[in-house]
């Protein structure tokens, strides 16, 4: 039975309430609170029971047949919500808004929050070391506006980007946004890519409210376009969270060229935050560098790695602090010990703003504040460029009010210390007196009645009672004044007038204590809410010093050196190492130099398979990134320019989802570098052209090398198996040949992993195949065929074109006119292919 098949006038009041809420939120799974359970009905029940492997049952609701139903305990809701979110669902939490015992008629219920991939705030559901971003895109007619926030921390950023579909998708992927809100004008190709290829939850809405409540976010904002962009996102968040949130920080607008540019492919190829194959954090660069002690520090480290600095003064300020911490190791160790005592202040502030912080959260804030004076002294001694507040008045409030070991729930009492509130103290004295009476009454009754097994107990059904064992029941006399209440297998339970009188006083005090403690706690939490922006500033400073102590710790452990950043374009890395590879291999790492002066823009790298060409290329990129985030680097000396971007084409894997072949992916990534690189960029091309036929691939590789050499001038590492290309050293004055050396003895090959000047003319592919234990007869046959090919081989002319402008002459005017009328930004891949075939036919005619 589906919800649309039901006559709402025939169902019970409770089910009518559910249906009315569900019909307003059709695309959301409703968790409907009934007592100690969340229950789901109709299609929601069917879907949830299937996805979570729950028992599907039925519920009577006034109809002839029971409606589908499943349920979960309310205290375990986060576990089930997380599983549904991972599967791409949104979950609406429908709570009871009044005490069922006090309700007149049907209990009032309503949605209090909609949970989606980008709006998770529960501590158990979030990863400490990663942000959980929700973002939006709006069409500004001439450009796209993008903003994003982590509602668990309150940071909020925005940028305006070209109206290029692939570019904006790449930027969203690079940031790691988990959920997108888009207006209806955003290109369907963008929506399709995000939803279908990258499995990002997308909501289409044009609603934009200009809330006065959020005006503080736009303080000192000069470009008011950003207000519209961000308000689109804030409207969605406010609507789904059913409240205003005061922990959003002042908007940070981003210029896309204010940090080193790296697209999502470059970040993946270099394994900055996860490995290529297993998508794991272990054995990535962040795994090596992360010795942070706080969750905000770990998240900031990830931000640093993905957005290296290009301002020399910022980089050198960080390097100065790292140097100081390495010299002042006692201070550094004291700092590390202190940071270990600091909790996740960013997300604690977020939970306070959300109204979901419990007493344990406030206790974590208090314990973090306690350590701040010591951290402030350390920061002063190392001349750190930021200061922190210590908020002694907030610490005093929490120290005087919150129990040291409070329960998780804020509705069970035992939250507030004695001495904080006079009325509460009076009630606690009354409760204590009542409990003392119970103990005294039990002893007196034993003495009075002679019943040695008599006990006084309590449960929620009968309240306080007198319990007498079965063996002594016959000794209970009428003059005792006991009234029988319950018969058990081994005992009888009674009440007495005196006990019931005291019970009323005790339970009344207990109930009042719980209510008063809850109200006092909420009052304290509201007070803490006024400190949110100051707590966030403290967290920001602590996160940065935490990252820098992590850099110092890693540098000491791994023998890293301070890089020298210059305004020149020379690269001089002596004994460079790939820090992650060095950490995980079971042998001594072979260090290599990278020297590229003003006369050398391109290193053409040849050498055997598996000899280390790719590692050498990645090594330089990793050293550059580490230097520009303010870290020491794995080398004995490193003199580097400031790079504005890194472009890579490393590895070859078909993009099966989008239907793009290895070669197409190669060409797209090469084109990205060619169109966007400057002379201050770093380009890494590994085996470019291998995805197509040999002559095609070699021709393209040479043309690309020439174009970079003549038109861009970027520092480039280009590895190849096309040994014919090594002739280019004699024809391109800024290109230099280097090779990875190997030792060949008695038909066996030993990889030396050492980079040397000059070229090699062998790839040793068959040797590598033998190392992979291919059958010996197969290896022998391959050697025979190789000898045949080597005898037939003719040297290919690598005549250089002086300059390769990216234009061409087409005589067919119809094709040109057709091209002029095409808007590439509005084309889907299929439409583009169709037009390509049409153009081909026109040229043929």
Q: Language model features by range: what are they?
A:
Residues 25-26, 85-87, 129, 140-142, ...:
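Short flexible coil/turn linkers enriched for glycine and charged/polar residues
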Residues 344, 354, 358, 368-371, ...:
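Charged, surface-exposed helical/loop "interaction arms" that form contiguous linear patches used
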Residues 488, 492-526:
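Extended, charged coiled-coil "arm/hinge" scaffolds of SMC/Rad50-like chromosome-maintenance ATPases
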Residues 358, 838-842:
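Short, small/acidic-rich helices and loops at N termini and domain boundaries
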Residues 207-213, 261, 276, 367-436, ...:
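Amphipathic heptad-repeat alpha-helical coiled-coil/stalk segments that mediate oligomerization
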Residues 8, 42-45, 223, 293, ...:
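ATPase nucleotide-binding head domains, primarily ABC-like/P-loop NTPase cores
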Residues 1-324, 333, 337-340, 344-353, ...:
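Charged catalytic and DNA/RNA-contacting regions of genome-maintenance
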């Amino acid at each position: 039975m589906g919800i649309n098949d039901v006559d709402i006038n025939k169902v019970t009041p409770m089910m009518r309430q559910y249906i009315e809420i569900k019909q307003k939120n059709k695309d959301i799974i409703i968790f409907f609170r009934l007592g100690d359970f969340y229950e789901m009905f109709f299609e929601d029940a069917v879907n949830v029971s299937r996805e979570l492997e729950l028992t599907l049952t039925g519920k009577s609701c006034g109809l002839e047949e029971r409606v589908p139903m499943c349920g979960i305990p309310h205290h375990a809701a986060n576990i089930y919500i997380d599983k549904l979110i991972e599967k791409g669902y949104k979950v609406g939490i429908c709570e009871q808004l009044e005490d069922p015992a006090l309700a007149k008629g049907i209990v009032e219920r309503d949605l209090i929050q909609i949970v989606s991939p980008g709006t998770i705030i529960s501590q158990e559901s979030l990863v400490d070391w990663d942000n959980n971003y929700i973002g939006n895109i709006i069409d500004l007619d001439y450009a796209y506006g993008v903003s994003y926030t982590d509602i668990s921390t309150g940071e909020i950023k925005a940028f305006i980007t070209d109206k290029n579909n692939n570019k904006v998708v790449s930027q969203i992927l690079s940031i790691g946004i988990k959920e997108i809100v888009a207006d209806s004008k955003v290109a369907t190709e963008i929506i399709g890519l995000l939803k279908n290829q990258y499995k990002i939850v997308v909501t289409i809405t044009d609603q934009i409210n200009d809330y006065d409540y959020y005006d503080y976010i736009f303080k000192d904002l000069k470009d008011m376009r950003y207000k519209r962009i961000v308000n689109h996102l804030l409207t969605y968040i406010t609507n789904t969270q059913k409240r205003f949130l005061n922990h959003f920080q002042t908007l940070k607008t981003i210029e896309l060229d204010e940090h080193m540019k790296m697209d999502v492919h470059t970040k993946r190829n270099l394994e900055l935050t996860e490995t290529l194959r297993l998508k794991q954090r272990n054995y990535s660069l962040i795994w090596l560098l992360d010795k942070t002690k706080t969750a905000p520090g770990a998240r900031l480290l990830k931000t640093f790695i993905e957005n290296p600095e290009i301002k020399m003064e910022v980089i050198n300020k960080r390097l100065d602090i790292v140097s100081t911490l390495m010299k002042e190791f006692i201070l550094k160790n004291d700092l590390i010990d202190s940071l270990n005592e600091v909790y996740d202040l960013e997300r604690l502030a977020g939970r306070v703003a959300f109204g979901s912080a419990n007493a344990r959260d406030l206790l974590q804030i208090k314990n973090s504040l306690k350590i701040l004076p010591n951290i402030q002294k350390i920061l002063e001694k190392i001349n750190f460029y930021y200061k922190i507040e210590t908020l002694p008045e907030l610490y005093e409030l929490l120290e005087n009010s919150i129990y040291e070991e409070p329960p998780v729930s804020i509705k069970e009492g035992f939250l507030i210390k004695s001495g904080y509130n006079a009325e509460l103290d009076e009630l606690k004295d009354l409760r204590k007196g009542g409990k003392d009476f119970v103990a005294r009454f039990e002893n007196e009754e034993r003495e009075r009645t002679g019943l040695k097994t008599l006990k006084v107990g309590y449960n929620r059904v009968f309240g306080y009672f007198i319990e007498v064992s079965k063996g002594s029941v016959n000794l209970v006399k009428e003059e005792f004044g006991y009234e029988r209440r319950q018969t058990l297998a081994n005992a009888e339970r009674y009440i007495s007038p005196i006990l019931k009188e005291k019970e009323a006083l005790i339970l009344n005090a207990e109930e009042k204590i719980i209510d008063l403690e809850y109200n006092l706690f909420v009052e304290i939490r509201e007070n803490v809410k006024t400190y949110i922006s100051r707590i966030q500033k403290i967290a920001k400073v602590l996160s940065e010093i935490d990252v820098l102590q992590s850099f110092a710790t890693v540098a000491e452990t791994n023998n890293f050196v301070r890089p020298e950043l210059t305004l020149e374009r020379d690269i001089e890395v002596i004994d460079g190492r790939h820090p992650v590879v060095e950490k995980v291999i079971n042998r001594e790492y072979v260090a290599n130099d990278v020297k590229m002066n003003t006369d050398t823009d391109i290193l053409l790298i040849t050498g055997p398979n598996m000899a280390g060409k790719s590692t050498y290329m990645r090594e330089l990129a990793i050293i550059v990134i580490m230097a520009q985030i303010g870290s020491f680097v794995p080398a004995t000396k490193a003199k580097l320019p400031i790079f504005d971007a890194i472009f890579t084409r490393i590895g070859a894997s078909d993009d099966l989802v989008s239907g793009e072949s290895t070669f197409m992916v190669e060409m797209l990534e090469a084109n990205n570098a060619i169109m966007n690189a400057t002379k201050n960029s770093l380009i890494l091309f590994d085996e470019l052209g291998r995805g197509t036929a040999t002559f095609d691939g070699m021709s393209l590789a040479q043309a690309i090398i020439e174009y970079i050499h003549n038109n861009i001038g970027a520092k480039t590492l280009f590895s190849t198996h096309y040994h014919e290309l090594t002739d280019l050293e004699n024809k391109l004055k800024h290109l230099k040949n280097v090779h990875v050396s190997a030792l060949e003895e008695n038909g066996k090959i030993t990889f030396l992993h050492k980079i040397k000047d000059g070229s090699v003319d062998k790839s040793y592919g068959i040797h590598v195949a033998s190392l992979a234990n291919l059958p010996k007869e197969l290896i022998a046959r391959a050697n025979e065929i190789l000898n045949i090919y080597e005898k037939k081989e003719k040297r290919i002319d690598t005549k250089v074109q002086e300059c390769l402008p990216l234009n061409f002459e087409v005589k067919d005017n119809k094709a040109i006119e057709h091209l002029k009328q095409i808007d590439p930004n509005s084309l889907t891949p299929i439409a583009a292919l169709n037009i390509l075939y049409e153009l081909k036919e026109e040229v043929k005619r």
